[in-house]
Amino acid sequence: KSQLKVLGIGWKEFDIYHHRGAAALRLKLEEELAGGDVAAVIYSNPNNPAWICLTEEELQLIGELATEHDFIVLEDLAYFCMDYRTDYGKPFSEPYLPTVARYTDNYILMLSSSKIFSYAGQRIALMCISDDLYSRRYDALSERYGDAGVFGVSLVASISYMITSGCTSSTQYGYAEMLNLSCDGVIDFVADTRIYAERAAKMKEIFLRHGFHIVYDLDVDRKVGDGFFFSLGFGKMSGDDLMVNLMRYGVSSISLSTTGSFRQGIRACTSRMRDELYPVLDERMAEFEKDFAKYLEK
């Protein structure tokens, strides 16, 4: 959204939590698409900050609408295979990760290295563009960028090259090798990152015991999974106030209001949690519950 602001391009957004399931999502998307002015749709799966995951049926709907209305789907897979309720850790074996790429050619998949590999070097990611979309020609691109108007070439050479800083060769080779080793079954990054789910479960238990609630608690008809992020609320306290008050107890977070959410609460992250901090968190949240008990009154 920050890039869109700089470029002067408009956007609209909605909180998908109230429109889950293929039928409800169809109604909402068709309402948003009715004006014919949507060029692309973007989402993260699993979702940041709620950690909800779109189902195969929902992704099929998005893909079919992308083809029907000719918009591009930007599928952010930064947390690739990190829905630990299903074992996606076996390369070239079922179950396969749900993706919109099965249902349309109008897709760009985005894969980051920083989450699945915890890569400590320069930030690097992949854009995986369908062959059909990559080779598609647009007169508008040719006119604006003075090239042949081939979508993939314009995106890489005329756009991404200009608005990103690039990445060192060593980082590119390192990322490529980690991807190769993952496909060969040498690196099991799903098992390596499962620690986030274990941390989330322990952290949630502490927060819930001290009066907090999970803001985004359901994934259609099942309990939301444990992973890198989760959402928290505390009675009637606003998300902004909760973020500030938690800081006074040594807990960092961001308000859901900064993420596009329309609900009150904060996003908690498991990345920096350590075993010796669970008793500390428990002790401090017990004090938090006592100090702000009035917000839990009905």
Language model: regions and residue ranges:
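Short hydrophobic/aromatic beta-strand micro-patches
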Residues: C128, S231-G233, C269-S271
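Conserved glycine-rich beta-strand-loop-beta hairpin in the small C-terminal domain of fold type I
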Residues: T168-Q172, A176, F189-L208, I214-G233
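Active-site phosphate-binding strand-loop segment of PLP-dependent enzymes
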Residues: H18-E94
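Substrate-binding/gating loop at the entrance of the active-site cleft, primarily
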Residues: K1-W11
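A short helix->loop->beta-strand "cap" motif at the edges of active sites that frequently abuts
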Residues: I9, E68-I72, T104-D105
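Hydrophobic residues in well-ordered beta-strands that form the structural core
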Residues: E13, V73-E75, Y175, S255
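PLP-dependent enzyme catalytic core of the Aspartate aminotransferase-like
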Residues: Y103, L242-K298
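Conserved core segment of the aminotransferase class I/II
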Residues: P98, R102-R194
